[in-house]
Amino acid sequence: MKWLVILGLVALSECLVIIPLTKVKSIRENLREKDLLLNFLKEHPYNMIQKFGLKGSLCSPKISCLRLWNYLDMVYVGNITIGTPPQLFSVIFDTASSDLWVPSNQCHSRACVTHRSFNPTLSSTFQSSNRTVKLAPHSGLVSGLLGYDTVQIGRFKSENQAFGLSQSEPVKELENAFFDGVLGLGYPSLAIQGTTPVFDNLRKQGQIPEPVFALYLSTNTKKGSVLMIGGVDNNFFTGNLKWVPLSARNYWQITLDRITWRGVVVGCTRGCQAILDSGSAFLLGPSRQISSIQKIIQARFIENEYQVRCCARTTLADFIFTINNVQYPVPARAYIRKGSTPRRCYSNFSGGTESLGKEETWILGEVFLRLYFTVFDRGQNRIGLRIAV
């Protein structure tokens, strides 16, 4: 897996902003090439669904909690600016969180000094709240302050925008990250209490023509992928979008009918929930079902990862995800990824979502989003899907 990083700030149309994206290496691939991945996974057990269901009990009543999680396989990053004059940052555009955070110049952790940091004294529009925030990733507690300033994405400006400024980042994987922070595109219910997410602020301030954004992930791994804000460019898909109503308004959550392989139901047997997550590279589900799927594709657990024969990418059948009575095939070339060496391939399925609650839940990450152009419609609380061109 690799990171998508912005090439240029924006390409403007009359009504929407289109942000071009391309790929660089993921933290996982970076560690693998340095022969550090195996030891890292042993020392830091990897929980891919850490960010979902984060409880406020992790922090005291006087401290706000901002969602933070594992970044080993995060996929989408792009450039924004904060402050006046603007300070540039590369951030993850994440649909499963709602906060914005970047490192502060007061952070001296190794993960901070290897990335861009925000200097409040250089911005004439910065306002401090003197409010502490705690970010709770799996391998350490990141602390910081809540501030307010002007945030710009393309030509859209969010005035007096709340964001977290990390002052300590004792999180090992962040040292190898190709991004500085996170910009969440989820619902306000996921945000720090008393704050407004960037997208909602832009909407309230009349910056966005339409309350929608969309993701197109090109099959060309190096170029062509884009994030659209404020509208939809029909050139990135064919036919009509298939609309799916949200089943909850926090994550971009929908109802999933079933998952089948060669006509046999292998997951979501009685209907379940699915979260579309641009901040995840994988297809995540309950461990029991995932274990069965790994056996189906003959994946073997080697060196803390599920490895698959590379020839299976062209021989195995599609998994069919049925959503709102529409079938969405996921072929083997998508659910089995190539490794950094020709003979190494890996499963893009992973378990652990049973910890989210009693109801069966699946996470549809890059594997799914790369196949289907996706519109996130806040105006009508729905998601639009169509085969990407």
UniProtKB/Swiss-Prot annotation:
Its main location: secreted. One of its GO terms (cellular component) is extracellular region. Keywords: Aspartyl protease, Disulfide bond, Glycoprotein, Hydrolase, Protease, Secreted, Signal, Zymogen. InterPro entries: Aspartic_peptidase_A1 (IPR001461), Aspartic_peptidase_AS (IPR001969), Aspartic_peptidase_N (IPR012848), PEPTIDASE_A1 (IPR033121), Peptidase_aspartic_dom_sf (IPR021109). Residues 1-15 form the signal peptide. Expressed throughout the chorion, with the signal localized exclusively over the trophectoderm. This is Pregnancy-associated glycoprotein 1. It comes from Sus scrofa. The lineage of its organism: Eukaryota, Metazoa, Chordata, Craniata, Vertebrata.
